[in-house]
Amino acid sequence: MKARLQSLLYGLRLLLATLSLGIGTGLVGIACHYLLEGVQGLAFGQDKGDLLQHFHHAGGFRRFLVLGVTGVLAAGFWYILQRRYKILSIRRQIDLAGDREPAFLAHLLHAGMQVAIVGAGASVGKEGAPREVGTLLAGRLGKAFSLAIKERKILIACGAGAGLAAVYQVPFASGLFVFETLGLAYSWQNLLLVLSSTYLATWVAQPIVWHGSIYHMSLVHWSASSFLQAILIALLVTPFALGFRSLAKRAGRKRRKDGTILWALPLAFLVLGSLAVFFPIFMGNGQVLAQILLSSQSIPYLPLTLAVKGLLVYLLLRNGAYGGTLTPSFALGIGSGYLVTLLMTVVGIHLDPALGMLLGATVFLGTTLQAPLTAIALSLGFTGQSLSLTIPLVLATGVSYVIRMRWEKR
């Protein structure tokens, strides 16, 4: 079989590997979807309402119990796993392509646990898991089709983007993510490989995963005053996003992996569980918090709520949990943009709260991901907004980018 594969034209082998990756990561997206729903159903019951109602109907004691048990199980799992295997990040897998292969089953279980803890209410993102499984699959396909090391690295990067696309149904944004965050060189070949894999993965997963935009909000329009709003939000939200990014990076660097994880991570989950007894809004990856604001509902003590949400993400990641920061960043950006818009109203400047939330989310995402173009595409894709909003979003991310560059040069 391998001899036959090697006999094929190299370009055809690369094409087949890319198509196989798109189909495979689409199936990964479906698996993540069912795993998340299965854990949520097991933990909180089969409720057909929205996610916040799901948490509410479970009751405070059940929320506390689920998070407490999840903390113990997650701590034991990651302690045992990391004693036996080294978890390789996506960037590390790209760097080591052809030299060292990650332990497939260990990394697969590692990704599954990330989805499971989010389903149980952990305050982190789930997006890391499909990206990591996508890179695993890409590495195996690159070897199976006897690709050169250069193309294997490209395929692994494509796997990360395709995994993200399958779960969130945002193929174009996921393609930009590969170029901006993984440093893939811009070329026609790379563009073709990336977009082929992301769009195919999205198409394969769509019948199961797609239920409309992830976040529901009315169509937003912009006017001349939107330019002022974009500049103000970029100036005021970027520093908060820089602070959150710094916390998240520190948590990743200092993440507990030794025996202390066995008490520290369960304790972190108990802190979250104690808050969730009274405030289920803190549970999950931030989707509940963001959707409440996007639905024009108010949240009492919003500044405190955002601060606590950000600290909970740090607390879990620092004490041994793994998970993403993309969706928490989006939620924090939604809240920050809304706050800035309200602040302007107090001083007599009346601006559109809905646009303010989108601007805040884009600025926050662009800063934490260090990927402004990806942030614009994700904000539009997540909320189903029209491309006409690109103009104020570009202005906001441009101003935010200048602030970030000046900050990093200090």
Predicted regions and their residues:
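Alpha-helical transmembrane segments and immediately membrane-proximal extracytoplasmic
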Residues: M1-R410
